[in-house]
Amino acid sequence: MFNRIFLFLLTNLAVLMLAGIVMSLLGVNPAQMSGLLVMAAIFGFGGSFISLLLSKFMAKRSTGAQVITEPRTPTERWLLETVRRQAQAAGIGMPEVAVYEGPEINAFATGANRNNALVAVSTGLLQNMDQDEAEAVLGHEIAHVANGDMVTMALLQGVLNTFVIVLARVVGGIIDSTLSGNREGGRGFAYYIIVFALEMVFGLFATMIAMWFSRRREFRADAGGAQLAGRSKMIAALERLSLNHGQNTLPSQVQAFGISGGVGEGLRRLFLSHPPLTERIAALRAASGSAR
């Protein structure tokens, strides 16, 4: 995990330095630019990493998930044994296993690293899926943990936050100075209105990028679930999800790591964290056909 963080931060430091050079060539004050880059990186990455570190605590609190410490029923015993077996196969530490009240068929994984994760399933999943289907869902969530998706998404969000902050202020300064005729860059009330509007616009594009990456990550988690539980079980689980008409009650901070996402067409699809279930099923079937 630390190698991934180091390489990611190193790459983005180089990008930020390049951005600083470009802005200097455009006439932006280098001293102001350096301070802006530092401030943006602190706020951009700071929020993402605080959310990552608190993710397990917040997920438990927001969903009311109850961690299974000592299994009291055959179902709880099966959950622990299945997660333990899959975690060993994936080469990660044993996650905490929890159950939360929810009518929808869903599950999620969260945590700061591969060896300190939480996997939770809804009561709706336990009531509406058989063990083969539930095993595939657990495999999907274990694959999220093994792939380091929580850390990667936090890093990506940090970079996007940083660029939104920087670009909004740089472009806002240029627009404000052009409109006011002050080449030194005005900092009046209009500047802050412009920056606020630009942050909203750039934030939408940043969300599209993050959700695009999230959708690609779901295909990988499906493939990982198929490897851990079996391709036919993973396909059956997704087909079962396609029949689920329950409302997604997962809190926003863990929805991206659930097995089931929203439904949308057109522009709304650009803001969905999960691909359509039909595409996920087709991808698994195509992979099965190419493997023969």
Swiss-Prot record:
Which UniProt keywords are given for this protein, alphabetically ordered? Cell inner membrane, Cell membrane, Hydrolase, Membrane, Metal-binding, Metalloprotease, Protease, Transmembrane, Transmembrane helix, Zinc
Quote the InterPro entries the UniProt record gives.
HtpX_protease, Pept_M48_protease_HtpX, Peptidase_M48
**What does the UniProt cofactor note say?**
Binds 1 zinc ion per subunit.
Where, by residue number, does Zn(2+) bind?
H140, H144, E218
- Mind telling me which GO cellular component terms the entry cites? plasma membrane
Q: Which GO terms describe its molecular function?
A: metalloendopeptidase activity; zinc ion binding
Instruction: Please tell me whether the keyword Lyase is annotated for this protein.
Output: no
Q: How would you describe this protein's topology in the membrane?
A: Multi-pass membrane protein
Where would you find this protein in the cell?
Cell inner membrane
Q: What is its main location?
A: membrane
Q: What is its EC number?
A: 3.4.24.-
The record lists the membrane-crossing segments as 5-25, 34-54, 155-175, 193-213
Domain of life from the UniProt record: Bacteria
Q: Where is the active site?
A: E141
Give the family from UniProt: Belongs to the peptidase M48B family.
Supply the name of the protein.
Protease HtpX
